[in-house]
Each structure stands twice: as C-alpha cells, then as structure tokens.
C-alpha cells in the first residue's frame, strides 16, 4: 500500500487521486455552497466599474492582503447553517428545508501611504482612494440587491493597513442542501 499523495501547493494530487482517497471512482461535483460562491464571484466581477486583476473564492475565514495594488475581488464563506422544517411530536426535526449560507463579497485595493521622505498622503489622494472603495461598495451592493436572493446585507470597511484597504458585503442566501 502506497502512502497518501502529498497535497502541497507545488505538487497537488490529481483529481483521480482525490477520488481514490475518498473511495469514489469519479471526481466529485462541486458543492452547492462552492457553486454559489462561484456564481457570486462571476456576478460581482461583471458589476464592478473599476477593474481588478485577481478574482477568487477565498479559502478560510480571512483574505490574504498580498499584492493589493493589483486589485482583488473575492468571495469567502462565513458560515452555513441548516434551517429545519416543522418539529415532530417526539421533538425530532422532520426535515431540513434549506441551508442558510452567509458569504462575504468584497474588494481589496491599495491606498496612498507615507512616502520615502516621511510625508503623509495628500487629502486629494486619500479622497480618490475612498472614491474607488465607495464605487466598489455601490457596484457590488447593486448586484446583491437586484440580482440575488441575498438577505441581511451589510457593508463594512477594513484597514487601511500596510497600504491596503478592503470593503466587503456580508449577506445570507438560501441554498439547497449541500
């Protein structure tokens, strides 16, 4: 019996190796949560007025603030919870009606920082940076409220930190059982 394949970045296992590890013959289909995240990413990308160089579904709870000057559009999964149907007389839930998935859809941009001479950013430059972030907010907010079934929609900004700033919408969508 050979050891399991290493799953590091430089030598990820092939799809057939994943299938062998899971006991499946064919590669699995993407989960409904991931498929929803991809659809949100595609819709968000088409809604943005200011282009980004990187668009991705982020793994984990945080988004890496690397190379922010390229501009990033991301979707991350915040949480997924089952919503149950009626409760039976014995106290058991009869069925799961749907899953409530909470996502974050946001952008990561660079902002002006202190220059090599120790001078802070000019007010004009800071205002221009804010204008781009606010346009991202408006574009993505319009997409979420007009083209999705998003609820509990809220925007917040993070940063600036290390020359980067981010703004993201958090919201919930109903999805079929994963």
Question: Which functions belong to the PLM regions below?
Answer:
Residues 1-93:
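Small/polar-rich, solvent-exposed N-terminal microdomains that initiate assembly or binding
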Residues 13, 19, 115-129:
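A solvent-exposed, charged loop/short amphipathic helix patch at secondary-structure junctions
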Residues 22-26, 34, 121-125, 144-145:
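Sequence/structural signature of long amphipathic alpha-helices
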Residues 37-50, 107-120, 175-178:
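Short N-terminal helix-initiation segments at or just after the protein's N-terminus
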Residues 45-54, 65, 124-177:
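Acidic-leaning, charged glycine-interspersed low-complexity segments
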Residues 74-75, 103, 110, 120, ...:
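Bulky hydrophobic/aromatic packing residues
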Residues 88-98, 159-164:
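Short, solvent-exposed beta-strand/turn "edge" segments of beta-rich domains on protein surfaces
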Residues 96-114, 165-177:
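Oligomerization/assembly interface segments of phage tail-like spikes and tubes
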């Amino acid at each position: 019996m050979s050891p399991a394949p290493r799953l590091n970045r430089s030598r990820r296992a092939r799809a057939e190796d994943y299938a062998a590890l899971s006991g499946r013959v064919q590669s699995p289909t993407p989960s409904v949560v991931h498929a929803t995240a991809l659809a949100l990413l595609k819709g968000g990308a088409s809604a943005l007025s200011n282009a980004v160089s990187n668009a991705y579904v982020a793994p984990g709870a945080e988004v890496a603030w690397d190379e922010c000057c390229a501009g990033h559009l991301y979707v991350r999964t915040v949480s997924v919870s089952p919503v149950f149907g009626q409760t039976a007389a014995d106290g058991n839930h009869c069925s799961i009606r749907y899953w409530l998935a909470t996502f974050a859809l946001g952008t990561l941009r660079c902002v002006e920082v202190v220059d090599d001479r120790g001078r802070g950013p000019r007010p004009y430059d800071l205002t221009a940076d804010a204008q781009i972030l606010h346009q991202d907010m408006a574009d993505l907010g319009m997409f979420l409220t007009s083209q999705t079934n998003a609820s509990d929609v809220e925007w917040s900004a993070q940063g600036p930190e290390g020359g980067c700033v981010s703004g993201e919408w958090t919201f919930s969508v109903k999805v079929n059982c994963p």
